[in-house]
């Protein structure tokens, strides 16, 4: 266990060291977060009505509802891109083959590659919410932070399975991933990101029930805007854990199979 944690830490420290050489990126991302929060605030002022507020979960403002949806889109993007990007960088730099012939296990390689991008995404989202709270009155007084952390953890587990599947596709086909963009498109419509799932046609509501994004957003909005406890959120948390229990083993098996296939065909390092 100590060796596993040390290896994961080394992956994280490597990525952090690389990121620290591009310090101006952090400044521009903070400015980008300010513009993003401002955009959602003024769009919400344009469309907010008492009728709309009553239709939203927790009866809050559209600004709070849409901002939570937008930052979760950032998490979904991170989950789907992180493993792809780490795999491409390791393959292009020639370190992938070296890693695979060492004692570094596949789960450690996958987890280590993901930890820094997820930490960076979390910090970026904290900046978004901070700007929104300081300048645009985003409501944080009803937040249950223990529930927020619990929902975030199970969401990352569920989303990671999707990201590893995406990386498996990249290993085999090398370029492009239409399945990833299809899932992002479906989630943006049938995931409850910018409007409630309840207003969708019945068939799209059915699609939403099979989408982990739906349950992640339901739970996060209840925890962040409605002071919901972990016990009160047992249903969406349990569903997200079920997604994780199914997707993580399947995705790891698929990723391992993809690696074996590329080794056999000799295309592991080919773009």
Residue ranges and their predicted role:
Residues 1-271:
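Hydrophobic transmembrane alpha-helices and immediately adjacent juxtamembrane helices
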């Amino acid at each position: 266990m100590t060796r596993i944690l040390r290896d994961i830490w080394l992956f994280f420290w490597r990525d952090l060291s690389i990121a620290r050489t591009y310090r101006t990126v952090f400044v521009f991302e903070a400015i980008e977060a300010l513009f993003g929060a401002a955009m959602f605030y003024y769009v919400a002022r344009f469309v907010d009505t008492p009728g709309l507020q009553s239709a939203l979960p927790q009866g809050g403002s559209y600004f709070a509802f849409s901002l939570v949806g937008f930052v979760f889109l950032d998490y979904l993007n991170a989950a789907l891109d992180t493993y792809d990007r780490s795999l491409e960088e390791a393959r292009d730099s020639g370190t992938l083959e070296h890693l695979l012939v060492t004692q570094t296990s596949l789960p450690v390689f996958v987890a280590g590659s993901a930890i820094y991008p997820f930490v960076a995404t979390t910090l970026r989202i904290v900046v978004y919410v901070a700007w929104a709270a300081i300048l645009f009155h985003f409501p944080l007084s009803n937040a249950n932070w223990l529930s927020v952390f619990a929902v975030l953890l199970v969401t990352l587990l569920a989303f990671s399975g999707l990201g590893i599947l995406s990386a498996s596709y990249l290993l085999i086909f090398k370029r492009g991933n239409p399945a990833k963009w299809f899932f992002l498109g479906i989630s943006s419509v049938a995931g409850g990101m910018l409007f409630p799932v309840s207003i969708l046609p019945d068939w799209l509501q059915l699609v939403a029930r099979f989408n982990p994004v739906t349950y992640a957003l339901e739970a996060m909005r209840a925890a962040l805007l409605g002071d919901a406890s972990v016990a009160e959120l047992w249903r969406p948390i349990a569903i997200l854990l079920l997604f994780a229990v199914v997707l993580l083993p399947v995705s790891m098996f698929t990723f391992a199979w993809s690696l074996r296939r590329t080794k056999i065909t000799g295309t592991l390092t080919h773009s």
